[in-house]
């Protein structure tokens, strides 16, 4: 007979043995882990690994003028575990800080909600961007404060007060960016706006490390193994911009006390010669320890100086858009250069009327461009959308029209190397069907023919239209950076794109734009010897109309294409044309005539009252 008590004892004994063995294995594992921890702690006590920050790349204008460079800056950091016995009163005296400020700062550093990476064994920021006086005072007394260190970095400096929104600025990296990119640590600087953000990886360089030896008291004794284990920092790459800083300064001066933008492009290369967003600001405001305060004030400004209107703002292009319509009508065979349309004070269809200013009627294409006849382009669109050549009727014609617009760079981002570029708006047939059902016709959408209605473009897209016409049908994606030190720019900044319109059609538009300058709405841009071609734009607005201009010069072998857009500036000839003319004269002639200097002074002093509402 089985002895069940004996069997039970065997199982219990086996269980006890297994439990003891498991306990010993766990303890051995823990001891091994602790030994590794103790080894790491011992090594950390013996050595201090210091991050060496690289110099950020400089920025130059197209003529080699230094725009952005670096100035040395020093931070005070500390390792809490090493700084436990520091005389806080003496430290506060050395830094010109009260004890209350000291303890408040320490509380913020130790607060893991504010500083999730906090550890008493790791380096923490204490004071950043010391003034020269603070640096000298602390360096002299640094030996009194074990566990506190000086860290050399650099902040940006600027040689000019212009182009702030283009150049951008640097600020402390966000927590979310640190989580996404292991390169960054708390307190690191990163490009936050403009080219500093777009070209962050090229500009930032590569951080290095310096391994320093400590004594038994934690004091730094010097380099470990004569720097054998150090990793040198690699400085950032310099950028040569396409920007002409003198042209940029003139543009910003002309736009003082106004809201709007200017974009100038070299047609052959797509290089942006100037890009003004008004109101502008001095880029040096966003450097140093006052950066946060100044950034907050600029952010609160209802005129939005931190917004780059040239790429982020979308506006009705007004009559500058008529050139794209003429190109489409010519290429589709809707009109010829000799086609004339009547203008009875505007476009009149049944009981609908879209007004126009006084000029001769009927008129063919080139005089229609020169006089900016609304009726001509409305009749052209009406003929296209009513044409029997499109089997799908108005909807097919509408989508064909949109194909032309997209090929000219509208309705999508062009791909400029600046953050925040907007798409603008080019509607298609589905858009109108959604809003009007199947009952819309050409007359329903007729205002798009003159750059109104649902059509919106960025000032950059308007300037690119000018560059495309100047090139007779091709453009290169507009860009701000001409060259990167030791690297190449993107391929699409070197490769021409073609529109759906042939060169011959463009020649007719060029002649019409030249006629606008010699005998039309752009006569204020008729500068002797420059052969300017232009097109005004007066974009309707709920308040006062916007003043726009798009042009290029010279007529043959053009060197500059430009768009000017002044919010609530009235007629295109009031602000757009004279500002555009002055900038083309400056760029092509190298300087302004005495008469033009007087005109520039007068325009810069003009004030447009925008009230107190947000823009």
Q: Which positions does each model-derived feature cover?
A:
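Periplasmic/cell-envelope proteins involved in peptidoglycan metabolism and beta-lactam response
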Residues: 1-290, 314, 336, 397-407, ...
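Beta-lactam-recognizing serine transpeptidase/beta-lactamase-like catalytic domain environment
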Residues: 68, 215-220, 225-228, 268-320, ...
